[in-house]
Structure formats: structure tokens, C-alpha cells
Amino acid sequence: MNTEATHDQNEAQTTGVRLRNAREQLGLSQQAVAERLCLKVSTVRDIEEDKAPSDLASTFLRGYIRSYARLVHVPEEELLPGLEKQAPLRAAKVAPMQSFSLGKRRKKRDGWLMSFTWLVLFVVVGLTGAWWWQNHKAQQEEITTMADQSTAELNADKDSGQSVPLDTGAATSQDTTPAQTAPAPATPVDSTAATQTPAPTAAATQNTVVAPSQANVDTAATSAAPAATETPSALPTSQAGVAAPAADPNALVMNFTADCWLEVTDATGKKLFSGMQRKDGNLNLTGQAPYKLKIGAPAAVQIQYQGKPVDLSRFIRTNQVARLTLNAEPTPAQ
């Protein structure tokens, strides 16, 4: 009768109550049990209160309860009915295995994506090359057009310049005539020769200028000698009065190492030069600053402005037509 009553009493007690009673009979505290089982005191308390922590898997909880039962000498078989209620076993969720075809589809999709990426890359590279080639071709056409224009302008200048020698010759003849006739009045004139030449008109006046000189030569050779000596003495005086022009501080000096097309315009819009310069040539231009320059081959020219070299490296690196403006810098006071 006593055995059956004890068995019924054990069945009425839960797992946590039985473990707590066994611990108290052995005189152990919750701290001591936790240290022996290497558990937290809160975990031991939850087991004795028949609580299942939400963050603890049922498999670990059943293992802790069995270790606790062995520690307090409680048979595990007597705790099995309570374990099923307190820590029931749950079926593990197993993800279904993916078929091999899914991996193949993913690999195929990655292959298409890679092919599309390469296609886009090739298109971008092709467009970039086409853009560069168009710019290069446009620059070459612009240089050719400018060279043709400069050639046409040079031909026009040559055609218009054929009349220049005639004008200069006429001007020199007009200049030399007063120069030749100017010394004539300075020569001594006899009164008899002067009375022989009438002066009613301008033509007669010219004859009177020539006649005294001839009469002077015929009558007295000694009077021609002072006139001859006076003429050379006047030449140094005229030469001394001519001074060399001062160098323009805003002058452009250019030296060419190869054939190059060039156009230079000053502030007034006047074209100081437009045409082709040959290798080993040099050019010195003066005008009103600032100057606007257009150079077909920047690497073929060296420019000095106000005694300083002009940097054209940025145009040489890009191999393009140089368009730049040179501003006048104030010169320091002397």
C-alpha cells in the first residue's frame, strides 16, 4: 500500500517539483547545482518551475533535465512522462534540396548577364573610338581649310602686289627729282645767265633751274667744286637726323621648326599674318595687344611675347589646333 501511494504521489508531482525536492533533501542550493552542471542559475530556476525558455531548444532542455536528475539521484525513467509535456520534441524543419537544374538555370542566367555586360562594354568602346576619330577628322579638315584660305589670300596678295613696284618707282622718281633739283638753287648763279632765262610759266621756271647749273658748269669750273663739296656735306646731316625705331615691347617673335599654318589678329581685328610658314623660318609681328593666335601645328612653333616664352604644352599634348589670346602685361617703370 505504501509503495503504490508513493508511486501515485510521484506521478502527481511535476518534473520540476521532483527535482527541487530531491535537491533540498541533499541540502544543495540552486547556485551549487548551477555550478556543477555549468548552467545559469536562471536556467536551474526555470527547470524547477517547469518553464521552457523560448530561446532554448527542447533538445538542450531535455539534456539539462537529465543531467539535473542524475545529480540529485532521480531515475530518468520516472521523468520521461513529464519531459514529454515540458519539453516535447519538435520535428526539425529541413529545407528541400534544390535540384541540379536550378543551378544550371542560374549558371545560364549568369552567362547571359556576362555576355550582355561585354556587349555593352564593346559598344561604349566603339562609340568612344568613333567620337575621337570624328574629332580628329574635323580638326584635319579645319587645318586643310585654313591652309587653302591662306593660300588663296597669298595668291590674291601677289596679284595685287604687282602694281606696287610701279607705284614705288613713281614715288622714287618724284622723290629723286626734288632731291636733284634742290641743290641747284644753292649753286652760285651768274647775273648774265639769270637774265637770259624768262619765267612766265611753271615750265619755264624748271628750265631756269637747269639753265643756271649748266651755265655755271660752262663758265666757271671753280664754282662747281664748292657745289660738289656742299652736297656730300649735307648727306651726313640727313643721315644723322634719321633715328632707328625703338623695339616694340608687345612684339611677337616666332621661330618655326617645321611647316606650320598660322593666323595672328590684333585687338583692332587686323590680320597681322595668315598663311603657311616653312621650316627654319622666323616671324616678327607688331600690333595692338591683345593678340589672337590660331596655330595649326603648335609643336612646330616657338613663341616669345614681351621677352618671355609662351607655353603651348597643353595643345601639344592633345595634338589639336591651338587657339589662344596673348594679353599685354604692364612693363615696369624705369
Curated annotation (Swiss-Prot):
Membrane topology, Periplasmic segments: 133-334
Annotated ranges, domain HTH cro/C1-type: 19-71
Transmembrane segments: 112-132
PANTHER family, per the entry: CYTOSKELETON PROTEIN RODZ, PTHR34475
Organism: Salmonella typhimurium (strain LT2 / SGSC1412 / ATCC 700720)
DNA-binding region: 30-49
Entry text on domains: The helix-turn-helix (HTH) motif in the cytoplasmic domain of the N-terminus is involved in the formation of spirals to maintain the rigid rod shape. As this protein is anchored in the cytoplasmic membrane, the HTH motif may contribute to protein-protein interactions to form the RodZ helix, which is localized beneath the cytoplasmic membrane. The C-terminal domain may be critical for determination of the rod shape by probably interacting with enzymes required for synthesis of the peptidoglycan layer, including PBPs in the periplasm.
Alphabetically ordered keywords of this record: Cell inner membrane, Cell membrane, Cell shape, DNA-binding, Membrane, Signal-anchor, Transmembrane, Transmembrane helix
Positions on the Cytoplasmic side per record topology: 1-111
Protein name, entry field: Cytoskeleton protein RodZ
Gene responsible for this protein: rodZ
